[in-house]
């Protein structure tokens, strides 16, 4: 029986959009459905006051993979935005990631030698306090890696806001390493390439899905597709939540989520940077995003008379919220593994993306994954 589609893709995020693009290039017919009223998943931008607002949080594309970079640039041109966040701790500003600028701001040190001596001295105090045992929690682990001042100013309260738990209650493995740069360099990423699509991420998604049949406001689980997809398509590409696909039969996986308060400010420049992290408990949000700085530089910032900011709050996931980050503790890792084993047994179903694989991915690795797949 000839079916109408080669692929039915559930979810219109980066995994599905890249997959549909490659399948269409190979002459296959695709249908993409998404329960949201828009395409693009979490990279979707909303235009407010002429500014592309990252509706689901800051998305900064970065990779060292030349093939991935050339692929996305073949769809849309990327600008040269460089991520250089600033941390605000009780009104004092520090450059991120931890580098010579940060150490000068914290201690007044001006040479790598002085900075290293200060860090090593504080690390030694933390190691001595453990009396020969391994760190038992995130707090002990971070103190051993960077020492007291950096931990208490830039890590402790920020991490507690992000996770909704105290650092002494979080497992040590969350922080494997904390890179310390003994150079004056505020570029957050070590990757060779980074930037934002010129005109916003919708341009990237629209380019990937050009000529592909797409339907929004369609919930896979509340539609004819849930039980009838095999009559319509040869293969299902599923990028929704892994546990939801199986009706939560083994139990629910936990997620962290974020929420945003977005508002227009009647001034051209609110904070002078795209990303400012608030690393103390006295401010309820974890960071403030000023969206225009992703795409407007120099005089362009002032040519646009208003600006849009989003305060980002990290919260416990509840029914009806958008799942963002997998909770990679022992219980959830084991449960996810059980679901993955079920997924492997599903015939003609590909599970993809952050939700479908219960793994945190940056954007570039998702695209890299799809580029490596045999789609035909």
Stretches found by the model and what they are:
Residues 5-32, 374:
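N-terminal Rossmann-like FAD-binding beta1-loop-alpha1 element of flavoenzymes
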Residues 8-10, 33, 230-243:
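Short hydrophobic core segments
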Residues 13-16, 37-39, 101, 160, ...:
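Short, solvent-exposed loop/turn segments at secondary-structure junctions
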Residues 24-49:
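Glycine-rich FAD pyrophosphate-binding loop
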Residues 46-71:
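N-terminal glycine-rich dinucleotide-binding loop that anchors FAD/FMN and/or NAD(P) in oxidoreductases
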Residues 68-90, 150-153:
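A short alpha-helix-loop-beta-strand transition element characteristic
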Residues 87, 92-94, 101-235:
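Active-site/ligand-binding neighborhood in enzyme catalytic cores
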Residues 234-235, 244-375:
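C-terminal segments that line or cap access tunnels to active or ligand-binding sites in enzymes
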């Amino acid at each position: 029986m000839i079916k109408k589609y080669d692929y039915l893709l559930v979810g219109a995020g980066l995994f599905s959009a890249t997959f549909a693009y490659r399948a269409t290039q190979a002459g296959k017919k695709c249908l993409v459905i998404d329960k949201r009223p828009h395409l693009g998943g979490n990279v979707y931008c909303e235009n407010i006051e002429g500014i592309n607002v990252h509706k689901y949080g800051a998305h900064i594309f970065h990779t060292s993979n030349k093939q991935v970079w050339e692929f996305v640039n073949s769809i849309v041109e990327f600008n040269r935005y460089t991520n250089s966040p600033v941390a605000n701790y009780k009104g004092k500003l520090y450059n991120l990631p931890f580098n010579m600028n940060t150490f000068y701001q914290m201690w007044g040190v001006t040479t790598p030698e002085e900075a290293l001596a200060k860090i090593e001295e504080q690390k030694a105090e933390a190691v001595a306090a453990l009396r020969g045992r391994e760190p038992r929690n995130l707090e002990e682990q971070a103190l051993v890696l960077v020492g007291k001042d950096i931990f208490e100013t830039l890590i402790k309260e920020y991490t507690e806001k992000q996770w909704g738990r105290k650092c002494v209650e979080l497992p040590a493995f969350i922080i494997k390493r904390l890179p310390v740069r003994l150079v004056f360099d505020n570029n957050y990423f070590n990757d060779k390439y980074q930037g934002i699509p010129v005109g916003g991420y919708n341009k990237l998604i629209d380019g990937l899905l050009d000529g592909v049949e797409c339907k929004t406001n369609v919930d896979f689980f509340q539609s004819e597709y849930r039980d009838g997809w095999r009559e319509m398509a040869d293969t299902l590409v599923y990028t929704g939540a892994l546990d939801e696909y199986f009706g939560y039969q083994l139990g629910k996986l936990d997620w962290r989520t974020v929420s945003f308060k977005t508002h227009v400010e009647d001034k051209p420049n609110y904070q002078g940077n795209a990303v400012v992290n608030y690393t103390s408990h006295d401010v309820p949000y974890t960071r403030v995003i000023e969206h225009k700085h992703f795409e407007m530089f120099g005089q362009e910032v002032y040519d646009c008379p208003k600006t849009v900011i989003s305060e980002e709050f990290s919260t416990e996931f509840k029914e009806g919220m958008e799942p963002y980050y997998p909770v990679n503790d022992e219980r959830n890792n084991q449960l996810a593994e059980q679901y993955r084993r079920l997924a492997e047994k599903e015939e003609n179903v590909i599970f993809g993306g952050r939700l479908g694989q219960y793994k945190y991915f940056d954007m570039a690795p998702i695209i890299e994954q799809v580029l490596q797949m045999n789609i035909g």
